[in-house]
Amino acid sequence: MAETLREHDTYDLYRRGVELLEDASFSEATVPLAEAARRAPEKSSVREALGRAYFRNRQFAEAAAEFEAVVETHPVNDFAQFCLGRALSLSGERERARHHLALAANLRPDREDYRLYRDRLRAAS
């Protein structure tokens, strides 16, 4: 019973964080999402949402850490690979960023935005 209640509370935190994220309240979204991630670090949906909130709040190193946690368990998650690459690039880790942007573009060759960021980073070196 206690575990079910905890899962429910964690889901409520996640939903509240996503609502704030969708309302462009990025800083505020990090609070419930960080708590949800603390309670359920294995939930990639929570970690991805927290990464998005950090990214939109220009906390690129924190965003990279969250997206890295997602790709460690889901390496074919093209969106997480892309976001990790962008966060690394914006936090100055361009070499690592190239790898993840290339992976994202290879996983989803139909995504023009993935190719665009990959190619821009290649050209900048």
Where are these regions (language model features)?
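Terminal, low-structured helical/coil segments at or just beyond the last alpha-helical repeat
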Residues: 1-6, 10, 98-125
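Short, charge-rich amphipathic alpha-helical segments embedded
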Residues: 35-53
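Alpha-helical segment of the N-proximal tetratricopeptide repeat
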Residues: 7-39
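Structural signature of tandem alpha-helical TPR/SEL1-like repeats
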Residues: 23-35, 57-69, 91-103
